[in-house]
UniProtKB/Swiss-Prot annotation:
Keywords: Developmental protein, DNA-binding, Homeobox, Nucleus. SMART domains: HOX. The lineage of its organism: Eukaryota, Metazoa, Chordata, Craniata, Vertebrata. PANTHER family: HOMEOBOX PROTEIN, HOMEOBOX PROTEIN OTX2. Residues 95-106, 133-143 have a biased composition (Low complexity). Belongs to the paired homeobox family. Bicoid subfamily. The keyword Magnesium does not apply. It is found in: Nucleus. One of its GO terms (biological process) is regulation of transcription by RNA polymerase II. The keyword Nucleus applies. Residues 93-143 are annotated as: Disordered. One of its GO terms (cellular component) is transcription regulator complex. This is Homeobox protein OTX2. Transcription factor probably involved in the development of the brain and the sense organs. Can bind to the bicoid/BCD target sequence (BTS): 5'-TCTAATCCC-3'.
Amino acid sequence: MMSYLKQPPYAVNGLSLTTSGMDLLHPSVGYPATPRKQRRERTTFTRAQLDVLEALFAKTRYPDIFMREEVALKINLPESRVQVWFKNRRAKCRQQQQQQQNGGQNKVRPAKKKSSPAREVSSESGTSGQFTPPSSTSVPTIASSSAPVSIWSPASISPLSDPLSTSSSCMQRSYPMTYTQASGYSQGYAGSTSYFGGMDCGSYLTPMHHQLPGPGATLSPMGTNAVTSHLNQSPASLSTQGYGASSLGFNSTTDCLDYKDQTASWKLNFNADCLDYKDQTSSWKFQVL
């Protein structure tokens, strides 16, 4: 600023102005002679001054102006310094209290963390205990075939009749027929007219012919020759095998049933994964629901 004022007079609108003219044009602008220090010097307190300040802080944390002036006279410091010291001292006290609280919480937290694994173990054991009864009850159901589990049967079929009450329907496909274990896997289909009467079996039987196009997609381990030979059998031969063609209303042109020969044994594995059939050559897979 001083160098700016020491410049020679310059013309403003053709008038030669001096520094006094600048003061007249800008009377509100002050030009300090010495630059102001932006940072104050740190105040170093002596031991005696700190003792006096600590004694007053022990009495009250918020002294009024009169108390601050009195202490400032005692320790020979400005009152503003005393006010700033009390402000810093209160902040330091709050910080110490927070550290103590955090330290107490840190001491209590490990105990909670130690007790939490026990709770997790107990919760895991509780969940395992909750899940074990369904698994134990589901295996005997499949093994003993005490009750039908109609997950693959159509939803519109009425409840099973008495001859089919002991059949395991986990192997049922899209047609309403069940495999009975009592006959020693002979597949004696009970063709009762009371159960199959008035039903259109074509809607349930025809899709199976398209789903079993090749030898890889057949569910039974017998070959394709046996399949074609059984598909071309007459109703008389179907009735001799215990299928009840007369009561079911099947004719000789129905080529969508996957039957077996009496000489060929189609053994059913009633295990926990009896619904998981995976053929390498077909994409028709049953998954456990």
